[in-house]
Design a protein with these regions (language model features):
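Feature recognizes metal-dependent phosphohydrolase scaffolds
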Residues: 1-662
Length: 662
C-alpha cells in the first residue's frame, strides 16, 4: 500500500482535480497514460551543420532521411515497379508540384486518383501505427481530419468495409477535392515520419538559404537546436555586435553568397559597395577573390572584382573592431590577435610570435599606423548604416527569437548529450574552467549553462545595462575565443590565411576535447559530469566535418561519441566525400544515414531523383524500445503517480468529486 502525504500535497491535488474532477476521469487518464507507455518510442532525427543549404535540408525532412522510401518499399516491394514507387515517393515529398506534372501527362486522371489515394492511405497507416489515435488526430488538417481517421482505422479485409472505403475515395474524387486531399495526406506522412528533430547547430553560414530553413522551422511540429558557432555569430550580429556584423558579411562575400543577407533579410550592402569601390579602387584585392565553391562560379568578372573589394573593406573593418574589443576585455587573453600593430607597413612584413613573415600585400589606405584600430570617418559612417540595417531587420529578429525559443548550448534527451562543438578540457581530460564573466569561472555543464544565459542576457532589454553590454561583446569571444565551447582552438587564423603565404601560420591548434574525444574514459567522465546516465548513453556532436574519403569514422570512443557533420555545405563535399549525415534513433536503435549530394528540387520533381542514402547500423537492441524507456516515459510515470494519489484522495474523502463545468 502506497503512503501519501495528502495534507502536504493538498494544494496541488485540488489543482489537478480541476482537470480530472471525478474518479472516472482520473481513472481513464491513468489507463490512457499506461497505454502510451507501451507504444514504441517515436523516431528522433539528428542533423548538424546545415550551413544554409536549404534544398538538401528540406528534402531530408521531406523524405525523413530515406525512411519514407523504405516504408514504400516494404509496403509495395512486390506489387509496384521501381518507377512507380519512385513516383509515389516524389508525390509524398512534393505533392503540389508533382500533381501539376501528373495532370499534364495522365490520360485517365480519375483512375490515377483512385489508385494513388489508396496507396497514400496505406503509407499513412504504416507511419502512424506507432502513435496513439489522439496524437495522429492532432497531426491532421481540420478539413480532412474525420475522413483521414476513417480511412486509417478501417480494415479493408472486411468486404463491407472495403465498399465503405471505396465510397469515401470516390466521393473525394467526384467532389473535386482529390488534389487537396493528396497534399494534406502527403504532409501528414512527412510529419509523422519524424517524431522529433534535433539540429546540432549551424543553420547559418555560407549557403544561400538559412532564412528559408528558419521560415520552415518556425512552424515545424517538434524540434530543438544546440546553437553552433555560425548561429551565435548571427545572433551576435542581431544583438548589435559590430564585429559579428562584419564577420557575417565577410563570410557571405567570401563565398559570393549574398542571398541570405540581401534577399532573406533585406540588408542594404550598397553603402559597403560604394565605400569599397572608392577606398580600394587601386587595389587588386587578389586575396579576397571569392571562393568558387560558393556562388562565385555564377558571377561575371566585374561583379567578382566588386565582391573582392567589398570583401577586403569589411575584413579590414572587422580586424579593427575585433582589436578594439580585445583591448576592452584583457580578461579574454587574446591580445596576440591584435595584429595590425605588428605590421611594418613600409617593408610589407608582419611579426607573429617573434618571427617575421612577408605579407602577400600591404595596401591598407584606411589604416593609420599610429592608431591602427581606429575606424576612418568613412568606415564609422558605413558601420553606422550597417549596424542600423541589422538592428531594424524584423525578419532577422523573428528568426533569432525562434532560435532562442527552441535552442540552448546543450541538451540531454533520452540518455544522449547533444552539443555542437566542444566541452573544453585540460590536458589530462579533466573539465577546464573558463572565465565567462570577469572573475567568474565555470566548467562542464555549468559552463554550458552560464554561456547560454549570457547569450539570452544580450536580448533582454530589462537586463543590467553593463551586463547586457558585456553579453553583446562576448559573442565575438564565443566565435573565435580560444576557450569558447563553440570554437576551442588556439586562434582563428583569418588574417594569416588572407595575408601570409606560409602555411605554418595558418595552423589552428585544436583544444584537448578534439584530441581526447576518442578516449572512452574521457567521454564517460564528461557524461558523468553532465549527469547523463543509462547503459546506452552517448555524446552527439557536429562542427568538425568527417572526412570519409580519408577513412575517418563518425563513431568514436567505442561507440559512445558520434560526430554527424558530414558536410551539407557544398564547400565540404570534396573534403568529406559525402553530403551530410542523419543519425536516426528509432525503437530498434541507432542508424547513421550517409547522404550523397542532392541535385536539386527541380530534378527530384521531374525525374524522381532522391538523395541516395547509405545506412550504417550503429547500435541495435534485441528489445524494441518503448515510450516507457524514454524521458517522456519518466514524465508520464510521474503523472500516473500524481493521478493515483488523486484517486486515493477522492476515495478517502480528502478531495470531493465535482461535476465538470459545461
Amino acid at each position: 500500500m502506497k503512503h501519501y502525504e495528502i495534507n502536504k500535497d493538498m494544494r496541488y491535488l485540488q489543482l489537478l482535480a480541476q482537470s480530472f474532477p471525478t474518479v472516472a476521469e482520473a481513472s481513464t487518464e491513468i489507463i490512457n497514460l499506461q497505454a502510451i507507455l507501451n507504444l514504441p518510442k517515436g523516431t528522433e532525427h539528428f542533423l548538424a551543420d546545415i550551413h544554409g543549404e536549404y534544398e538538401a535540408f528540406l528534402h531530408v525532412l521531406k523524405n525523413a532521411s530515406g525512411n519514407i522510401k523504405r516504408k514504400v518499399n516494404e509496403l509495395f516491394g512486390n506489387t509496384l515497379r521501381e518507377a512507380e514507387k519512385r513516383e509515389l515517393c516524389t508525390l509524398i515529398y512534393y505533392p503540389e508540384q508533382k500533381l501539376e506534372l501528373v495532370k499534364q501527362n495522365e490520360p485517365d486522371i480519375n483512375d490515377w486518383y483512385h489508385i494513388t489515394l489508396h496507396q497514400l492511405v496505406a503509407v499513412c497507416r504504416d507511419v502512424s501505427s506507432k502513435y496513439t489515435r489522439s496524437k495522429v488526430r492532432k497531426s491532421l488538417p481540420c478539413d480532412f481530419s474525420y475522413i483521414i481517421q476513417e480511412l486509417l482505422h478501417e480494415h479493408t479485409e472486411d468486404h463491407d468495409k472495403t465498399a465503405y472505403v471505396n465510397v469515401i475515395v470516390d466521393t473525394i474524387i467526384s467532389t473535386g477535392r482529390a488534389d487537396d486531399f493528396i497534399i494534406a495526406i502527403a504532409n501528414v506522412i512527412q510529419r509523422l515520419a519524424i517524431d522529433q528533430l534535433h539540429i546540432l547547430g549551424d543553420i547559418y553560414d555560407r549557403g544561400p538559404g538559412a532564412h528559408i530553413i528558419l521560415d520552415k522551422m518556425r512552424h515545424y511540429h517538434s524540434w530543438d537546436i544546440q546553437w553552433g558557432n555560425h548561429d551565435v555569430l548571427w545572433m551576435g550580429a542581431a544583438a548589435g555586435n559590430d564585429a559579428c556584423i562584419c564577420n557575417v558579411i565577410r563570410l557571405s562575400l567570401r563565398y559570393a553568397n549574398l542571398a541570405t543577407l540581401e534577399e532573406g533579410y533585406g540588408i542594404n550592402l550598397i553603402p559597403l559597395a560604394t565605400f569599397a569601390m572608392e577606398a580600394y579602387k587601386d587595389d587588386e584585392c587578389a586575396e579576397f577573390i571569392p571562393k568558387m565553391s560558393g556562388g562565385a562560379a555564377d558571377i561575371d568578372e566585374k561583379t567578382q572584382r566588386l565582391t573582392a573589394q567589398m570583401h577586403k573593406a569589411i575584413a579590414v573593418i572587422q580586424f579593427k573592431i575585433e582589436g578594439q574589443l580585445i583591448a576592452k576585455h584583457p580578461e579574454w587573453k587574446m591580445d596576440k590577435r591584435r595584429l595590425f600593430e605588428h605590421i611594418d607597413y613600409e617593408k610589407k612584413e608582419i611579426e607573429i610570435d617573434g618571427k617575421i613573415y612577408p605579407m602577400t600585400s600591404c595596401h591598407f589606405p584606411t589604416i593609420n599606423p599610429a592608431s591602427p584600430y581606429e575606424l576612418s570617418s568613412e568606415e564609422e559612417l558605413l558601420m553606422t548604416k550597417l549596424h542600423h540595417s541589422f538592428m531594424v531587420c524584423e525578419k532577422l529578429h523573428k528568426h533569432i527569437k525562434v532560435m532562442l525559443q527552441h535552442g540552448c548550448m546543450y541538451t540531454i534527451i533520452n540518455d544522449n548529450l547533444l552539443f555542437h562543438a566542444s566541452c573544453p578540457l585540460n590536458e589530462d581530460g579533466s573539465l577546464k574552467e573558463v572565465e565567462i564573466f570577469p572573475g567568474k569561472k565555470f566548467a562542464g555543464r555549468e559552463l554550458m549553462h552560464q554561456t547560454g544565459m549570457q547569450i539570452r542576457t544580450a536580448f533582454q532589454s530589462d537586463s543590467d545595462p553593463k551586463e547586457r553590454e558585456y553579453a553583446i561583446d562576448y559573442f565575438i569571444y564565443l566565435w573565435c575565443g580560444p576557450d569558447s565551447p563553440l570554437f576551442d582552438k588556439s586562434k582563428m587564423a583569418t588574417f594569416e590565411r588572407y595575408f601570409i603565404n606560409d602555411k605554418e601560420t595558418h595552423k589552428e591548434e585544436k583544444g584537448y576535447y578534439f584530441l581526447l574525444r576518442d578516449d572512452e574514459q574521457v567521454i564517460d567522465h564528461i557524461m558523468d559530469a553532465f549527469g547523463v546516465t543509462g547503459p546506452n548513453r552517448h555524446i552527439i556532436n557536429g562542427h568538425v566535418p568527417v572526412r570519409t574519403t580519408k577513412g575517418e569514422n563518425p563513431i568514436k570512443a567505442n561507440g559512445k561519441l558520434m560526430v554527424i557533420d558530414g558536410g551539407f555545405s557544398k564547400a565540404y563535399h570534396n573534403e568529406t566525400g559525402i553530403a551530410g549525415y542523419t543519425l536516426v534513433y528509432h525503437s530498434r536503435g541507432f542508424q547513421l544515414v550517409q547522404h550523397e549530394p542532392f541535385t536539386s528540387m527541380e530534378d527530384a520533381i521531374l525525374r524522381g531523383t532522391d538523395i541516395k542514402s547509405t545506412t550504417q547500423i550503429v547500435e541495435m537492441s534485441n528489445r524494441r524500445m518503448l515510450v516507457a524507456d524514454t524521458d517522456i516515459g519518466q514524465e508520464l510515470r510521474k503523472q500516473i503517480a500524481d493521478l493515483e494519489e488523486l484517486l486515493y484522495a477522492y476515495r478517502h474523502g480528502f478531495v470531493k468529486e465535482s461535476e465538470r463545468k459545461k
